[in-house]
Swiss-Prot record:
NCBIfam families documented for this protein: PRK15068.1, tRNA 5-methoxyuridine(34)/uridine 5-oxyacetic acid(34) synthase CmoB
EC number(s) recorded for this UniProt protein: 2.5.1.-
Organism: Glaesserella parasuis serovar 5 (strain SH0165) (Haemophilus parasuis)
Top-level EC class: transferase
Oligomeric and partner information: Homotetramer.
Binding site for carboxy-S-adenosyl-L-methionine: K89, W103, K108, G128, D150, P151, T152, I179, E180, M194, Y198, R313
Name recorded for this polypeptide: tRNA U34 carboxymethyltransferase
This protein's encoding gene: cmoB
Length: 320
């Protein structure tokens, strides 16, 4: 099983120390309720090699071995990593193996990065972090510590697999909880929430929860689905959106800015809008599930298969 004690030691003398009042008990309870496959995934981590390597997090997530693996060793590594499929967010380049994930998350990072306050020496929270691709890119920008939260057990095991192949780097940590389970720490310099808001039944509550994790003057980076329209326009899908059952509210950019200001954020601005393309989200050898092309109207890719506007994402920056 995955040991969280090193993380407790890390935060004991940090601005996150108050989290130790609740977190250890929460994670003990979490371990009792884990998915049936979790033990199998966690045990697989023991089979991964940990070899001397050069780590590059500056422009990708890469671990280059001093001495390359043999063909047989590479085949075994691929076999172990594919036990953790589907790999959704990446890509990763590890020990000569290219994990070509469903999402080219580097595309999103390239859109977001130019607009951020410098991440160097910052304490960062990444909400809904998935397997942690963007967390490693934040570390590459010089963050002091990045904490990701995501309750999905597979993502935790994928993250720990990548960490092991990155020289067991402790500057990033994934905690398998949701934002609603976190006490208000008001301790993070930057909080990211990317690809989460539209899954929330109460989006304003989610924005308030993000605000409660930021220091005064801290920065929120919010990325979410949007539609065209004015301050009054919000899409509430009748049933599914792009075959997703758990999509509740997709606002226009002006409506989203209004929500953020309503919960108390300042200096709210939209810095990027991008339609999701099949270059950014597509099927690969590391994903057997359906992907973007399966979610769109086959006759008109400007619409989802249900007839709604096709996915478009906006990046919003705001100050606490």
């Amino acid at each position: 099983m995955i040991d969280f004690r090193p993380f407790y030691q890390q935060i004991a003398t940090s601005p996150l120390s108050a989290w130790l009042e609740t977190l250890p008990l929460q994670l003990k309870q979490w371990e009792k309720q884990t998915h049936g496959d979790y033990a199998k995934w966690a045990k697989m981590l023991d089979h991964l090699p940990s070899l001397p390597c050069e780590v590059n997090l500056a422009d990708k997530v890469e671990a280059r071995l001093v001495e390359p693996l043999s063909a047989g060793e590479t085949q075994r590594l691929v076999h172990h990593l594919k036990q953790l499929m589907p790999w959704r967010k990446g890509p990763y380049h590890l020990y000569g193996v290219h994990i070509d994930c469903e999402w080219r998350s580097d595309f999103k990072w390239d859109r977001v990065l130019p607009h951020l306050s410098p991440l160097k020496d910052r304490l960062i929270l990444d909400v809904g972090c998935g397997s942690g691709y963007h967390m490693w890119r934040m570390v590459g920008e010089g963050a002091k510590m990045v904490v990701g939260i995501d309750p999905t057990e597979l993502f935790l095991c994928q993250f720990e697999a990548v960490r092991k192949l990155l020289n067991n780097d402790r500057r990033a940590n994934l905690i398998p909880l949701g934002i609603e389970q976190m006490q208000p720490l008001q301790a993070f310099d930057t909080v990211f929430s990317m690809g989460v808001l539209y899954h929330r039944k109460s989006p304003l509550d989610h924005l308030a929860q993000l605000k409660n994790q930021l220091v005064k003057g801290g920065e929120l980076v919010l990325e979410t689905l949007v539609i065209d329209g004015d301050i009054n326009d919000v899409l509430v899908p009748a049933d599914r959106y792009a075959k997703m059952k758990n999509v509740y509210f997709i606002p226009s950019v002006p409506a989203l800015i209004n929500w953020l200001e309503k919960v108390g954020f300042k200096n709210v601005r939209c810095v990027d809008e991008a339609v999701t393309t099949s270059e950014e989200q597509r099927k690969t050898d590391w994903l057997e599930n359906e992907t973007l092309v399966d979610f769109l109207d086959p006759q008109d890719h400007s619409k989802t298969i249900e007839g709604y506007p096709a996915p478009k994402r906006a990046v919003i920056i705001a100050t606490n």
